[in-house]
């Protein structure tokens, strides 16, 4: 009898869960309003289409009006950071696969993501391979998991 066949993983309930902080809708709306006002003040015609709060940053997605250059928004990164009183702003221009620009602004209160959060998710429950690993949460708060045996040049063999 092989040890691998008789071994059972410990229950996920033993793992610590992270804090349940969530960004308030009021704060998200205020930041969205400040952001759209700033763009308007700099002559950028754009529409806020989506707000994606994550554990450490919130992505504000905007679509530019026809004729507005993406470079006009990307050149405003320091002005956006200054206006929102944040040390850094990241711009995704464009968001891959979409005709929108993502403006990622750090949350004032960051959520601690623990391994328990990732491995107790419904996505992790669907996986049965013994070499699945929880990596963390993506910007949208969705669990990111990886099967080590599927990695190229992996030295792990079962």
Predicted regions: what they are:
Residues 1-6, 156-158:
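Conserved small/polar residues in nucleotide/adenosyl-binding loops
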Residues 4-152:
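N-terminal "pre-motor" subdomain/linker immediately upstream of P-loop NTPase catalytic cores
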């Amino acid at each position: 009898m092989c040890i691998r066949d008789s071994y059972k993983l410990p229950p996920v309930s033993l793992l610590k869960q992270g804090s349940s902080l969530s960004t308030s809708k009021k704060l998200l709306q205020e930041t969205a309003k400040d952001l759209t006002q700033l763009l308007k003040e700099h002559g950028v015609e754009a529409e806020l289409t989506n707000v994606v709060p994550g554990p450490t940053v919130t992505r504000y997605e905007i679509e530019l009006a026809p004729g507005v250059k993406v470079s006009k928004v990307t050149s405003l990164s320091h002005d956006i950071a200054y206006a929102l009183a944040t040390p850094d702003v990241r711009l995704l221009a464009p968001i891959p696969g979409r005709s929108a620009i993502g403006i990622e602004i750090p949350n004032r209160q960051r959520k601690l993501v623990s391994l328990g959060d990732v491995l107790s998710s419904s996505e992790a429950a669907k996986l049965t391979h013994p070499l699945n690993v929880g990596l963390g949460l993506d910007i949208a708060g969705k669990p990111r998991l990886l099967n080590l045996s599927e990695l190229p040049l992996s030295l792990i063999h079962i």
